[in-house]
């Protein structure tokens, strides 16, 4: 008879088989009411799951991330039930959980409208209130295929046909609705109390463009209405900060259909781009990196040697010339090895740090493109360090310092660090993996950093550290990485002469601080809601004359500031001063310098900030000093000086 071990180490013994629900009820009525599922020996199961043997059991509630995912998954099924009741001819396909929500793909004869979404959501609320029990059943494969074909659900039948022969075919029933699913699910629809349908988008069946186009309905679901409301508020705030909207409003960049996934940078946006690029250039140059530049178009033979032709070909732009196949480079690493390979290298030459603002192209599906965040053409602040095994730890430690300086200078201080270790399928001896993983771990520990371990998540060619930023809305963005590579240098013939005269293959460290510059600028725009720190702002101050009498004075101030390398404009238009102030405030210019007859007489400027603060009258030299001091702080606040 089963003995159940609970998370606190206590044991409960039963003289008969029990369900997860039975155990929850034996612990307490409150837990039984809150229970959504169980985790039996680490495996997530329904509350109705029967336990016959001794196991370790955790009761899963909506305070558990798995519990929240179950709510979202079950809400996707609730949506499918509502769609079938309202649109019986619709076919149901797949509906997984995604970050903060879920989606379900449907095949239907016409596009779903906004009114349809409202009707579906209303029907979902009605079905949830009916509090249907959710039952799991195991079916025979042929019986399941026959049932779904009879119901007109061809996609479900196809899914079952493609499952491995040994796979258990389980279905879940709630009310009159029945759906194919591995589960687990919440025990009844009454547990689904806080959800919102968000949008409809197109999606190909199984993600293949030669398959049918389906309709994907996205939604979000939360344990309670308070959390839902907070999430919708964050979404609304994110919408205000959308870099695409701000990019148009501030005339920074645009995208158009003739070049999908590739940005057209306008003068002000390009100024931001150059400032970010130049910052990284100065930072890396000061840490011993040498900047290089490599070709955009490279013969397929190099990509075959590196392994990218076999593994990455679908994401490459390929062309042919004079009977030779070329690929526009999707990454820079094989080209950097070619630079390393020019000339004999000694152990005295290592570590060798090669950096490039490498322009890469990847043939991302058009449906995944999103402003600057997901593009087809991007520039990486890419670098590769060629070193010995014994140099890994110091190089990683130096890179960690570099990363944190950069993030702090850009105004980010909340960084999540993850160490990914060896997967089951890998190259290289275990002793080498031991050494590399220890070096990465030791570098993190010596820096006094908190980090998360991701066992088995490393690449097949080496372990890695990933750096993820949190922005002002609490969203996470994976940016920096340093990746140990035991494979590529050997594949591409990289060697060095060791101290004992033997030839050895160097270790290669792939590393980036920002990753895609385009994506990082999109993150910056949203983090600051377009109000970039003065050092990054495309226009740092604007001089505004009240009447034509101050025009010459305004031009002299503009000229003087520009001679100091500052980005200052003079707006001499014949417009009311209030209009000009409002316009430049909306453009998020950090400072507006108003000049009238009094300012001309006293050689001063009346300073206003984009936040609406009136700093009063300042001598031109005093404001110049203030602005230069603020720029020198970069993205750091006064308290960090």
From Swiss-Prot:
Q: Which organism is it from?
A: Alkalilimnicola ehrlichii (strain ATCC BAA-1101 / DSM 17681 / MLHE-1)
Q: What class of enzyme is it?
A: ligase
Family per UniProt? Belongs to the class-II aminoacyl-tRNA synthetase family.
- Protein's name according to its UniProt entry: Threonine--tRNA ligase
- Record's keyword terms, sorted: Aminoacyl-tRNA synthetase, ATP-binding, Cytoplasm, Ligase, Metal-binding, Nucleotide-binding, Protein biosynthesis, RNA-binding, tRNA-binding, Zinc
Q: Which gene encodes it?
A: thrS
Q: Which Pfam families match?
A: HGTP_anticodon, TGS, tRNA-synt_2b, tRNA_SAD
The biological process GO terms on file are:
threonyl-tRNA aminoacylation
Q: Which chemical reaction does it catalyze?
A: tRNA(Thr) + L-threonine + ATP = L-threonyl-tRNA(Thr) + AMP + diphosphate + H(+)
Q: Which cofactor does it need?
A: Zn(2+)
Q: Quaternary arrangement and interactors, per the entry?
A: Homodimer.
